[in-house]
Structures are given as structure tokens and as C-alpha cells.
Design a protein with these regions (language model features):
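Conserved N-terminal alpha-helix of the aminotransferase class I/II PLP-enzyme fold
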Residues: 63-96
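PLP-dependent class I/II
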Residues: 2-4, 8-14, 19-32, 38-56, ...
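Basic nucleic-acid-binding alpha-helical/helix-turn surface characteristic of O6-alkylguanine DNA
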Residues: 59
């Protein structure tokens, strides 16, 4: 038979989803699995969004405009003003999730062989989107001991060469929960200006900042307006992962023109998803407050529990709803598989994402996992008990000297 493409062979497996068949099999055996592996919010979608879905009364489900409905884009402009992000409807392109926004940013701005600098650990799908676009990810290391803070400028400049085309950040960060400071954002701005790079900024977790520190959007950085592409999504903000609605936002008209060609090729973003997303913008302030308060409590529950567990260390995440934790294990991939295939405590086990899948540096993250705190607190507490029992029983446990 014909061979599979090099692109297909190079495409990485998702560290978040690759163990899913093992979880299905564990459940088939009657094991309860606590899903800490995926950022699927469990909190309710805004009632106004659900009501809009129920009230759809159409005789035809047509293509929507390739750029997305104007009424939705106009309403988004008002939403972003709350964060001091001033854009016009024409600056916004509605996409099939934030993922499509990232992919089209890469496709529109990068040539095959171009390089993107990304702090690691990084959201694993960035690597997949870069491969799809023929580009290459060049990672700059951050460390768990320093809370995954951004390295100094010199470390970036060591990676910059004639092929470097862009810097990609996620702020607040997935998978680490790190929040970039004003100094770090200014550092990135200066690099973008000095080397005339693109800045792709994934800001889908902006609503979840827990430290009292200010939210610094890439759109706030002066002097690089035409270099900046903002990625957004309703998935995490409204617990609407399934409607697949995101946005690509840029003041650069040439980028928008290029992106629109890809949008026209895929015809239209989801019609029904846009109806729900537009209605969800009417969610009351109490909705955002209640969701935020719940994640604050979950973060405390998880991080306190992890750091009380012998041999485990987690920095305190400043945003999003993830943390990367270091475990006393020889290999977190093996450990996560073992938890699903061979272990249970009183008929229960845990599912986590091996952090090595969020790194491109060989061997990095080998003893780390990403944990999403998207379970109710009593389930998080129970999952921590099960995790501790798993670590006690794991044959590959490694004790620090």
C-alpha cells in the first residue's frame, strides 16, 4: 500500500488523550477513574447560552459568513473592552475553536522551515499545528524550581537566527498555570520589535488569574500592534468546549486577508456554536464570579494536597486551571499507564497527562505530570488520596537523596 506521509508520521500523539483507551478499559473492568488529565470544565455553561440553544427555531441551518457573524463580532468588541482590549469587528475572525485560530495564524504567517520560539513546557497541540504548517518549534526551557518563569532575554537571543519568524506564548499558561509579569511581557515586546517577529498570544484563560496581579495582554503592548495575533476561545470561559468557537484577533490587515483565504476554504465556522457563544456574552457578573471562586477553592485544595504528599512538589499556579507537578517516579508516562492498567485503590484510580508530552527536549518532564483541577472539591480530595496510594505502591518509585 502507499506510504503514510512524513507529516503524518511526525505528528505527535496528544499526551492528554493518548491514554484514553486505557481509561475506557479500566472503566469496563468496573474501576472509577478520576479524570485529572484534560481541561474539560465541569462547571455549568451559562444558562443564557443553553437557552439560546434550546430556542433555535430554524427551517434551514445555512453556512455562516466565513469571518463569522457580524453581530457576534460586534458583541465581542464590547466584551474585550472590559479587559482594555480595543478592537473593531473587522479585527476579529471567528474560528472553529482556538485550535483553528492557532493553525491559521501559523499557516498565514509562516513559511515551511520557519521557526517559532515557544517556552516549554507548552500546550502540546502547538507542536502539531507547527508540523501541519511546515514550521518548526524551537523551545526555550523553563524550570519547575523557578515556577516556570520566563528565561532571560539572552536565552531567547541564543535561539534567534535567520529562520526565526515568531514567538508563541500562552498567558495564563497551559500547562503550568504561570502568569507572565509586566516585565516579562515587555521583554517579549522588545524582542519582537528588535527582530521584527510575529507574536502569537493564546489568552483563553484570562478570566482565571488568582494572584491579584494585572492581566497583561499582548494587545496592550505598544509598538507591535501589527506583529501581534491574539488567540481566544469560549471553551474554558463558558464551559463550551463542544461548540468549537474561537477567535483570531489582529490589527494587521495583511494577516487577516491571508487568514480569510483559509477560512473561505473551510467555508464557515459553526453556525449553532456562534448562536450559543453570542448569547453567552449576556451571562451575568455572578456567573463569572461563581466560576472564578470555585476554581480558587479547587486550586487551594489540589496544591495543598499535592505538596502534603511525600515526594511530590507543585508550584502554586497563578492562573488557568492546571498545574505541573513533580512526582517521585522513574517515568511519569509509565506511571500514568500503570495507574490505569494495573492499579486501583478501593476500586478507584487517577488519570493524568504525562508532562513529557508538553516538552520537545528529550528527557524533559520525565518525572512530571499535568493535572487539571476540573473536578468538584470532594472528588479532588479523593483523587489525591488515590494518587498518594498509587505513589506508595508504584514499583518505579524514586526516593530523593
Amino acid at each position: 500500500m502507499p506510504e503514510i506521509s512524513v507529516r503524518g508520521l511526525e505528528m505527535p500523539e496528544s499526551p492528554i488523550r493518548k491514554l484514553a483507551p486505557l481509561a475506557v478499559e479500566a472503566k469496563r473492568r468496573g474501576i472509577k477513574v478520576y479524570h485529572l488529565n484534560i481541561g474539560q470544565p465541569d462547571l455549568p455553561t451559562p444558562q443564557c447560552g443553553l437557552d439560546a440553544l434550546k430556542k433555535i427555531d430554524r427551517t434551514l441551518l445555512e453556512y455562516s459568513p466565513s469571518q463569522g457573524y457580524l453581530s457576534y463580532r460586534e458583541k465581542l468588541c464590547d466584551f474585550y473592552k472590559k479587559f482594555n482590549i480595543n478592537v473593531k469587528p473587522d479585527d476579529i475572525i471567528i474560528t472553529a475553536g482556538g485550535s483553528e485560530a492557532v493553525l491559521y495564524s501559523f499557516m498565514a504567517c509562516l513559511n515551511p522551515g520557519d521557526e517559532i520560539i515557544v517556552p516549554e513546557p507548552a500546550y502540546a497541540n502547538y507542536m502539531a499545528f507547527a508540523i501541519s504548517a511546515g514550521a518548526k518549534i524551537k523551545t526555550i526551557a523553563t524550570s519547575i524550581e523557578e515556577g516556570f518563569a520566563l528565561p532571560k532575554v539572552e536565552k531567547f537571543e541564543e535561539l534567534i537566527n535567520e529562520k526565526t519568524r515568531a514567538i508563541m506564548i500562552c498567558n495564563p499558561n497551559n500547562p503550568t498555570g504561570y502568569l507572565y509579569t509586566r516585565r516579562e511581557m515587555n521583554q517579549i515586546r522588545d524582542l519582537v520589535k528588535k527582530y521584527d517577529l510575529y507574536l502569537f498570544s493564546d489568552e483563553v484563560y484570562r478570566e482565571y488569574i488568582y494572584t491579584g496581579s494585572p492581566y497583561i495582554s499582548a494587545m496592550h503592548l505598544q509598538g507591535i500592534e501589527n506583529n501581534t495575533v491574539l488567540i481566544d476561545s469560549v471553551s474554558k470561559r463558558y464551559s463550551e468546549c463542544g461548540i468549537r468557537i474561537g477567535a483570531l484577533i489582529t490589527k494587521n490587515e495583511e494577516i487577516r486577508k491571508a487568514v480569510m483565504k483559509f477560512c473561505q476554504a473551510r467555508l464557515s465556522p459553526p453556525l449553532i456554536g456562534q448562536i450559543v457563544a453570542e448569547a453567552s456574552l449576556d451571562a451575568p457578573a455572578s456567573y463569572y464570579r461563581d466560576v472564578y471562586d470555585e476554581y480558587v477553592e479547587r486550586r487551594k485544595c489540589l496544591i495543598d494536597g499535592l505538596n502534603r504528599t511525600p515526594g511530590v512538589y507543585s508550584p502554586i499556579p497563578m492562573g488557568a486551571f492546571y498545574t505541573v507537578a513533580k512526582l517521585p517516579v522513574d517515568d511519569s508516562d509509565k506511571f500514568c499507564r500503570w495507574c490505569l492498567e494495573e492499579f486501583n485503590y478501593e476500586g478507584e484510580t487517577v488519570m493524568m497527562a504525562p508532562a513529557s508530552g508538553f516538552y520537545t527536549t528529550p528527557g524533559a518532564g520525565r518525572n512530571q505530570v499535568r493535572i487539571a483541577y476540573v473536578l468538584k472539591r470532594e472528588d479532588l480530595q479523593r483523587a489525591l488520596v488515590v494518587l498518594q496510594k498509587a505513589l506508595e505502591a508504584y514499583p518505579g518509585r524514586v526516593e530523593e537523596e
